[in-house]
Swiss-Prot record:
GO molecular function per UniProt: acetylcholine receptor inhibitor activity; ion channel regulator activity; toxin activity
Record lineage: Eukaryota, Metazoa, Spiralia, Lophotrochozoa, Mollusca
Annotated domain remarks: The cysteine framework is I (CC-C-C). Alpha4/7 pattern.
Protein name per the record: Alpha-conotoxin In1761
Tissue: Expressed by the venom duct.
Residues modified to 4-hydroxyproline: P7
Modified residues (Glycine amide): G17
Entry's localization field: Secreted
Coiled-coil parts of chain: none
Any one GO cellular component localisation term in the record: host cell postsynaptic membrane
Amino acid sequence: GCCSHPPCNVNNPHICG
């Protein structure tokens, strides 16, 4: 998912913590 793959996880701290 997003939280396992940069830059998505870096760009979505409100989702990924």
